[in-house]
């Protein structure tokens, strides 16, 4: 049986709008994600999807409740400790790629590994090139972001997110700025990573096609899990 990679218990998130007014985003949410799952989180705007994702990734803290990542409770960690966890165990992909414009594709992918300092610079460069090969950009090593299409930029961002072999890959609307063809290519890449590498993938999306093709779909309404369903993994093209 697959191990639990992410566990959330009694998560409540409130925003302080003023001295006397608080808004509840997530009222009381508990959830387990298992190693090797491909999960889509859906729901209307304002349902708490991105807030939930950021709490999973340690980018935001719950008002109450606890989060465990890979068996370690992360809710009590300070920012310096959480930065180390994010660098080593979590890969993030956003709607906008956030690539450094002055650096090439391979340099952007190298950045997380240079920060971690687990490998020498030569090996880091070789690993970055292999990651770009894996996402189909073997001929774009030296291209800067402005020399790449939107879909190619997002694939560089995915390669960068994979640089330190994360336990969990988190995506916040990663296909939101892409045309349908590029969005499908990104989905196929996520599905391949999930199938071939057993990579745990959790994606917030408004894309119904993307969500329906994931192995598990969690639908939020008003910060509560309205449905949580698993489907047979669909074959990729």
Curated annotation (Swiss-Prot):
Keywords: ATP-binding, Cell inner membrane, Cell membrane, Membrane, Nucleotide-binding, Translocase, Transport. ATP binds at residues 43-50. SMART domains: AAA. It comes from the Bacteria. Its EC number is 7.6.2.-. Its main location: membrane. It is a peripheral membrane protein. The keyword Transcription does not apply. One of its GO terms (molecular function) is ATP binding. GO terms for cellular component: plasma membrane. It is found in: Cell inner membrane. Belongs to the ABC transporter superfamily. Lipoprotein translocase (TC 3.A.1.125) family. This is Lipoprotein-releasing system ATP-binding protein LolD 1. The lineage of its organism: Bacteria, Pseudomonadati, Chlorobiota, Chlorobiia, Chlorobiales.
């Amino acid at each position: 049986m697959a191990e639990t990679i992410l566990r959330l218990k009694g998560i409540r998130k409130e925003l302080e709008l003023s001295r006397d007014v608080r808004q509840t985003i997530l009222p009381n949410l508990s959830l387990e994600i298992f190693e090797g799952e491909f999960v889509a989180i859906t729901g209307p705007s304002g349902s708490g999807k991105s807030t939930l994702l950021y709490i999973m990734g340690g980018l935001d803290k719950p008002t109450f409740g606890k989060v465990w990542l890979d068996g370690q409770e992360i809710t009590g960690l300070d920012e310096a400790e959480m930065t180390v966890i994010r660098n080593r165990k979590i890969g993030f992909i956003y709607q906008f790629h956030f690539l450094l414009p002055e650096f090439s594709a391979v340099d952007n992918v190298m950045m997380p590994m240079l920060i971690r300092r687990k490998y020498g610079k030569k090996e880091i460069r070789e690993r970055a090139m292999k990651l770009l090969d894996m996402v189909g950009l073997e001929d774009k090593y030296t291209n800067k972001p402005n020399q790449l299409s939107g879909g190619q930029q997002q694939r560089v961002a995915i390669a960068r997110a994979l640089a330190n072999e994360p336990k969990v890959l988190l995506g916040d609307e990663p296909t939101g700025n892409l045309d349908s063809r590029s969005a499908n290519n990104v989905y196929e890449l996520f599905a391949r990573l999930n199938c071939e590498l057993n990579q745990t993938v959790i994606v917030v999306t408004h894309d119904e096609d993307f969500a329906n093709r994931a192995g598990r779909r969690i639908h939020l309404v008003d910060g509560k899990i309205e449905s949580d369903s698993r489907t047979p993994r669909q074959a990729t093209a």
